[in-house]
Curated annotation (Swiss-Prot):
Gene Ontology annotations of biological process type: autophagy; COPII vesicle coating; dendrite development; endoplasmic reticulum to Golgi vesicle-mediated transport; vesicle coating; vesicle tethering
Family listed: Belongs to the TRAPP small subunits family. TRAPPC4 subfamily.
InterPro entries: Longin-like_dom_sf (IPR011012), TRAPPC (IPR007233)
Compartment list: Postsynaptic cell membrane; Golgi apparatus membrane; Endoplasmic reticulum; Vesicle
Protein name: Trafficking protein particle complex subunit 4
Length: 219
């Protein structure tokens, strides 16, 4: 069981904190000789497989690493342009790792804003007054859990569908936010959370929840 991600969204719909705790990925790594027998193309500043599905590599997968070095968008971590590098026969043999494209910071901001809007729509559509809004969304691979405070801050956790005790974990995260963000004299309300103690205690809470499978009182 696992907790995949934690998001904190302010009352205006802005993403003020995000942590990827654990994200299972269907990744495939293979060593290639020249010429590369896959067709790669640039799309949305990512290098994607356009043709040549094989050995766990799928159309739409992105180039994640070359020779063990991470790829960020269209460039490797040391600044090499991916398509240019792979087009040079002198660089072969080459090991390439493929997988689902990772979300960019801008995409995470956009998704947080979209969820904020959906939450508001859900509250308005409720036949009963005082609706709590969206508390959980379920898919076949994860569950999204949301807890909104009285001040409008939303704490969102993406977790394995089998993970128990998320309601208690959400309230624990709120407690950590109150203790290590709100009480930090250098933190401004509604602004991105950059507090080391908040990071440390949040990661510890996630570890406890994952190991126990639940997060009960006294944790």
């Amino acid at each position: 069981m696992a907790i995949f991600s934690v998001y904190v969204v302010n009352k205006a719909g802005g993403l003020i904190y995000q942590l990827d705790s654990y994200a299972p990925r269907a990744e495939a790594e293979k060593t290639f000789s020249y010429p590369l027998d896959l067709l790669l193309k640039l799309h949305d500043e990512r290098v994607l497989v356009a043709f040549g599905q094989r050995d766990g590599i799928r159309v739409g997968h992105a180039v994640l690493a070359i020779n063990g070095m991470d790829v960020n968008g269209r460039y490797t971590a040391d600044g090499k342009e991916v398509l240019e590098y792979l087009g040079n026969p002198a660089n072969y043999p080459v090991s390439i790792r493929f997988g689902r494209p990772r979300l960019t910071s801008n995409e995470k901001l956009m998704l947080a804003s979209m969820f904020h809007s959906l939450f508001a729509i859900g509250s308005q559509l409720s036949p009963e007054q005082g609706s709590s809004g969206i508390e959980m969304l379920e898919t076949d691979t994860f569950k999204l859990h949301c807890y909104q405070t009285l001040t409008g801050i939303k704490f969102v956790v993406l977790a394995d569908p089998r993970q128990a005790g998320i309601d208690s974990l959400l309230r624990k995260i709120y407690e950590i936010y109150s203790d290590f963000a709100l009480k930090n004299p250098f933190y401004s309300l509604e602004m991105p959370i950059r507090c080391e103690l908040f990071d440390q205690n949040l990661k510890l809470a996630l570890e406890v929840a994952e190991k126990a499978g639940t997060f009960g009182p006294g944790s």
